[in-house]
C-alpha cells in the first residue's frame, strides 16, 4: 500500500536463490528499473551456503570450502553490487561477533561477544555507501510500557550522518546524506575504465 499511494510500480520476486538475484540484477542493469530492494540478503547468503553444501555433499562446511565460497560470492554478488548502475537497498539480520581472550584468573581462553554484524559474507556489509543498525528498545515502569526503535549510522560515505543515532527514524532523517550522494550521478551507460593488470607487477 505504501508504494501504491506513492504511485510507484513494484515488481516482486520471492526467492532466496543467488541465481535468481543475479538474474534480477542483470535485468536492472539492462534498464528494467532504477532501484532494487533485497529483503533480506541474509536469506540469500544462507541459501547460497546450503546450495554449496548440497553440491559437495557435506552437512558441515570445512575450512578449505571458504576458499571457494568467498570468491564465488564476491564474483557473483559483491562485485555487481558495487559496479552496477542502479540503486540497491538491502537489509539483513544482525548477529553477534565473537572473540576470545585468556582469563587471567583461570588461565583458560574464554569466548565473549565483541560486536554486532550483518549475517552475510564478512566483507559484504561494508560495501554499501550507507550502513545503518536498527535496534528495538523497551522500557517498563510499572504499568507504563514504552517501545521505540533507534537507527545508528555505522557508515556514511558522505560523512554527514556518520555515527549519528535517530530515535523512531523517518526518511527525513536521511535526506541530507542521500541528497549528497546523489549529486552528479554517472549516467547508466557511463564508460568504465578497465582495470590495469596487477599481475604484471609480480616478478616470477
Identify the residue ranges that each predicted region occupies:
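Phosphate-binding/switch region of NTP-binding enzymes
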Residues: 79-174
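Arginine residue identity/basic-tract feature
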Residues: 13, 27-29, 57-60, 75, ...
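Low-complexity, flexible helical/coil segments
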Residues: 24-28, 70-79, 128-134, 188-192
